[in-house]
Amino acid sequence: MTRVRRGYIARRRRTKIRLFASTFRGAHSRLTRTTTQQKMRALVSTHRDRGRRKRDFRHLWITRINAVTRENRVSYSYSRLIHDLYKRQLLLNRKIPAQIAISNRNCLYTISNEIIK
């Protein structure tokens, strides 16, 4: 039986996986089987944490807005501010007021005072 020369397909696949896992530590970047497992695990974590990142940022923005609004007036809270925004039909997402709260608190104070009136 004659010798069959293998193609480059399998080597190309393994090289692609190795390049992906080149920053992993130890055997996770050297051995093909563990590299493949770690690549799948990394992709699963990335997919899961994409949704988690959205939740975390929303939580952070809400906390920032709430802190600034409570600092201004004791009776005024985050939920009341958002409720008044919706009543006035000012459709702002949580990110914009949070940035305003950090960069320019007086601006957020004026917005909240105008909404109350």
UniProtKB/Swiss-Prot annotation:
Pfam families, sorted: Ribosomal_L20
Domain of life of the organism encoding this protein: Eukaryota
One GO MF term attached to the UniProt entry: rRNA binding
One cellular component term from this protein's GO annotations in UniProt: chloroplast
Matching InterPro entries: Ribosomal_bL20 (IPR005813), RIBOSOMAL_L20_CS (IPR049946), Ribosomal_protein_bL20_C (IPR035566)
Localization, UniProt: Plastid, Chloroplast
Keywords, in A-Z order: Chloroplast, Plastid, Ribonucleoprotein, Ribosomal protein, RNA-binding, rRNA-binding
CDD domains: Ribosomal_L20 (cd07026)
GO biological process, alphabetically ordered: ribosomal large subunit assembly; translation
Keyword rRNA-binding: yes
Keyword Electron transport appears in the UniProt entry: no
Protein purpose: Binds directly to 23S ribosomal RNA and is necessary for the in vitro assembly process of the 50S ribosomal subunit. It is not involved in the protein synthesizing functions of that subunit.
Record family assignment: Belongs to the bacterial ribosomal protein bL20 family.
Stated name of the protein: Large ribosomal subunit protein bL20c
Organism listed in the record: Liriodendron tulipifera (Tuliptree)
Name of the encoding gene: rpl20
